[in-house]
From Swiss-Prot:
ATP binds at G39, V40, T41, G42, S43, G44, K45, T46. Residues 432-598 form the Helicase C-terminal domain. Its main location: cytoplasm. The keyword Ribosomal protein does not apply. This is UvrABC system protein B. GO terms for molecular function: ATP binding; ATP hydrolysis activity; DNA binding; excinuclease ABC activity. Keywords: ATP-binding, Cytoplasm, DNA damage, DNA excision, DNA repair, Excision nuclease, Nucleotide-binding, SOS response. The UvrABC repair system catalyzes the recognition and processing of DNA lesions. A damage recognition complex composed of 2 UvrA and 2 UvrB subunits scans DNA for abnormalities. Upon binding of the UvrA(2)B(2) complex to a putative damaged site, the DNA wraps around one UvrB monomer. DNA wrap is dependent on ATP binding by UvrB and probably causes local melting of the DNA helix, facilitating insertion of UvrB beta-hairpin between the DNA strands. Then UvrB probes one DNA strand for the presence of a lesion. Residues 637-672 form the UVR domain. SMART domains: DEXDc, HELICc. Gene3D superfamilies: P-loop containing nucleotide triphosphate hydrolases (3.40.50.300), UVR domain (4.10.860.10). The beta-hairpin motif is involved in DNA binding.
């Protein structure tokens, strides 16, 4: 019997939530394809979403526009559904340099990437959950619209093991190799297996804590057990069956691979003829050499570097057809929730064009076959065509969502806690930094936190350095900081390890920090997408979860965007005040548990934390007591920054010996920094 969604919470729907939940469910039952939930900050939109999921009992994909928000939603959904499958699917690259060709300098840049092992495991776990069960909440970023292995091929490649099966040990090992598992009898880690006599231990690629032990008696499966890889302790003995999933989504059955290679050879021949007719001899030689090498690798190993560029043939799709994506793994009756839709929808539409322009260069100059253009994100119209029933969630819905839903908007403006939108003040730009510093001191004295947003990365770093020099515990947050570090920084702010977080565009949609009582928006009168009315409303909303919430806009004039943002905030304040008065509610601050949503091990967390704090030019353990050490560390950090800039410049100028020398000097300075700390 299929497991049902079971919402676990000490709270019951209140305020506008009960009415919103009923309206959304009625619309879903009526078959409405698109609807909008307009929910103000702090009104409990996530709780409403969780109630809709439980009441509808439908597998759900939640799309978020960045990894930070996705991680936060994942953590909240895990708390609401502890007995169900809550999964996380975002890009697994900590660093990614796609292959590219620059014709002006005749420079080919090889694909280079650093894969986050933990997130890769979570992606594999997500697709496994979609295939095995119905009670799945999957939180994803726009990675969901990028090409993924074909689900049919993926399912065909699974290795099913049953007690009593007759199977030769060599056949098991051969099948594991086809699934891209590696034999490692010394270090037993994810995606590997080891052999000890008639016992084969397999560490599934999608698993974090459980491995499979297969015991053979001659050619018969005698026993299957689950055990903890670290301790070797058996958790389940004598299991009837076990399924081993492939190590990657890009696995293909041998017969499909052989057919695909024949088609690749045909395309290669046609492409070579075209290039020769155009007298492009270098390009013809290049495409022949590169493609033949890939074909050899696929025949020998079953995969090659960049195998995704042949996904059209591997998935058996026609030219121009949409690639297989995570959306293809969803069950028929799935529900799609697009969180912060005013940003996420436009992001979905932008992915295809950027990818296309880069690949066209690679095709034109003989680095890839034209079929590589079909390894791409979904076009927006393709996404619309395969999207299931959709719920758009935002405090500031965009024009697209309103049009698609036929203005079917469910409002959730009243907060159950009685919290009122922040009061807004406008102050002059001339004294903004000093004024901000005095406001920060007032907040830190009573244990509250502050967010400050600037217009550029350089401004955020300079402001953080200036506040740090004046004894304020501060860090900054921007796009250079990877997914897990961002979540750790936000968690540390809530824990009080520092008091001020400076950012640019990341301190907006969805970030849930009830301890923040002041949002300071510097240069608020500079019109642009960072200071549009929607952006301002979202940023101001970060202080709406605190009973003392206030927002200060530093500006020399009130722009149209500022006025619209202030008018909308006042409208919401008035509605909440009237509701509180009618029901005798006294506003109460949120008391939300602080958890590490990613459930990461201490070792890796510490390593990342150390890296983040170096980038932020501070040492967490010595804000006050070790001032001298901090200054020494800061001096070393400045030297590291200077050397790194020289190193990157040398690499760009193709002076690799000089870059290598500078790299070694940077490594030595980092060792000095460790000793200083």
């Amino acid at each position: 019997m299929a497991k049902k969604f079971e919402l676990v919470s000490k709270y019951k729907p209140a305020g506008d939530q009960p009415k919103a939940i009923e309206s959304l469910l009625d619309n879903l039952d009526a078959g409405l394809a698109h609807q909008v939930l307009l929910g103000v900050t702090g009104s409990g939109k996530t709780f409403t979403m969780a109630n809709v999921i439980e009441r509808s009992q439908r597998p759900t994909l939640i799309l978020a526009h960045n990894k930070t928000l996705a991680a936060q939603l994942y953590g909240e959904m895990k708390e609401y559904f502890p007995n169900n499958a809550v999964e996380y699917f975002v890009s697994y690259y900590d660093y990614y340099q796609p292959e590219a060709y620059v014709p002006t300098t005749d420079t080919f840049i090889e694909k280079d990437a650093s894969i986050n092992d933990h997130i890769e495991q979570m992606r594999l776990s997500a697709t496994k959950a979609l295939m095995e069960r119905r009670d799945v909440v999957l939180v994803a970023s726009v990675s969901a619209i990028y090409g993924l292995g074909d689900p049919e091929s993926y399912m065909k490649m699974m290795l099913h093991l049953r007690r009593g099966d007759i199977i030769d040990q060599r056949d098991v090992l051969r099948r594991l190799a086809q699934l891209q598992y590696k034999r490692n009898d010394a270090a037993f880690e994810r995606g590997t297996y080891r052999v000890r006599g008639d016992v084969i231990d397999i560490f599934p690629a999608e698993s974090e804590e459980i491995a499979v032990r297969l015991e053979l008696f001659d050619s018969e499966v005698d026993r299957i057990s689950f055990f903890e890889p670290l301790t070797g302790q058996i958790t389940e003995k004598d299991v009837a069956r076990a399924t081993i999933y492939p190590k990657t989504h890009y696995v293909t059955p041998r017969e499909v691979l052989v057919k695909a290679i024949e088609k690749i050879k045909d395309e290669l021949k046609d492409r070579r003829d075209i290039l020769l007719k155009q007298n492009k001899l270098i390009e013809e030689q290049r495409i022949n050499q590169r493609t033949q090498f890939d074909i050899e690798m696929m025949l020998e190993l079953g995969y090659c570097s960049g195998i995704e560029n042949y996904s059209r043939y591997l998935s058996g799709r026609a030219p121009g057809e949409p690639p297989p994506t995570l959306m293809d793994y969803l069950p028929d009756n799935a529900l799609l929730i697009i969180d912060e839709s005013h940003v996420t929808v436009s992001q979905i539409g932008a992915m295809y064009k950027g990818d296309r322009s880069r690949k066209e260069n690679l095709v034109e100059y003989g680095f890839r076959l034209p079929s590589a253009l079909d390894n791409r994100p979904l076009k927006f119209d393709e996404f619309e065509a395969i999207a299931p029933q959709t719920l758009y969630v935002s405090a500031t819905p965009g024009k697209y969502e309103l049009e698609r839903s036929g203005n079917e908007v469910v409002e959730q403006v009243v907060r159950p806690t009685g919290l009122i939108d922040p009061q807004i003040e406008v102050r002059p730009v001339a004294t903004q930094v000093d004024d901000l510093m005095s406001e920060i001191r007032l907040r830190t004295e009573v244990g509250e936190r502050v967010l400050a947003t600037t217009l550029t990365k350089k401004m955020s770093e300079d402001l953080a350095d200036y506040l740090d020099e004046h004894g304020i515990k501060v860090r900054y947050l921007h796009s250079d900081i990877d997914t897990v570090e961002r979540m750790e920084i936000i968690r540390d702010l809530r824990l009080g390890k520092f008091d001020v977080l400076v950012g640019i565009n990341l301190l907006r949609e969805g970030l849930d920090m009830p301890e923040v009582s002041l949002v300071a928006i510097l240069d608020a009168d500079k019109e642009g997408f960072l200071r549009s009315d929607r952006s301002l409303i979202q940023t101001i909303g970060r202080a709406a979860r605190n009973v003392n919430g206030r927002a200060i806009l530093y500006a020399d004039r009130i722009t149209g965007s500022m006025q619209r943002a202030m008018d909308e905030t006042d409208r919401r304040r008035e509605k909440q005040i009237a509701y509180n008065k009618e029901h005798g509610i006294t506003p109460q601050g949120l008391n939300k548990d602080i958890t590490d949503v990613m459930d990461l091990g201490q070792g890796s967390a510490k390593a990342r934390k150390s890296k983040a704090e170096k980038a932020l030019a501070e040492v967490a353990s010595g804000y006050d007591a070790r001032t001298v050490v901090v200054k020494d560390a800061k001096a070393v950090m400045k030297e590291i920054d200077a050397k790194e800039k020289e190193m990157y410049k040398a690499a760009q100028n193709l002076e690799f010996e000089q870059a290598g020398k500078l790299r070694d000097e940077v490594a030595e300075l980092r060792e000095q920094l460790k000793r200083a700390v």
